[in-house]
């Protein structure tokens, strides 16, 4: 995917405007008499070999362009300052261009809890290369058929996806 396409994705996300908010679908029911003490509530989650204080992280956003690098650096700074996990966007562009620095956030944020992701269409050896290059806590494998179908340059061959997922799960 070209740098222009990555920037186009950013532009679409920024231009998207909607009055819909999924939080509007949540109805909080007032309970005057609580059944538990606040100290009894524990949001700790065990995931990826770690205990997380609460299940909140910055999920895969972008990568693969100069603008994406700026966004990733800002998100990484916030995540590091707050002790939250940051997941980079799909490393596909980084695999194509060894000079792409948009994913290289650890050098400026050494205490960052980092993960990255890769598309299921990528061979598992490319996933291993991604891990070797970025040293994330884990590799997230994304499956996004609709995105592939909507992008003119998107993947059109899906017969390997199931085997790839099985290999990623064993690796």
Language model features with spans:
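An N-cap/entry alpha-helix motif that binds or orients negatively charged groups
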Residues: 1-48, 52
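Short N-terminal helix-initiation segments at or just after the protein's N-terminus
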Residues: 1-5, 21-27, 52-61, 79-82, ...
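Short secondary-structure boundary/capping elements
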Residues: 39, 67-71, 94-98, 156-160
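A generic local structural motif
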Residues: 43-45, 101-103, 126-127, 162-163
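Active-site cofactor/substrate anionic-group-binding motifs, chiefly glycine-
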Residues: 47-93
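Active-site beta-loop-alpha junctions enriched in small/polar residues
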Residues: 61-63, 91-93, 117-121, 144-146
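Alpha/beta enzyme core
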Residues: 76-81, 108-109, 113-114, 121-171
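A gly/proline- and charged-residue-enriched helix-loop-helix capping module
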Residues: 82-119
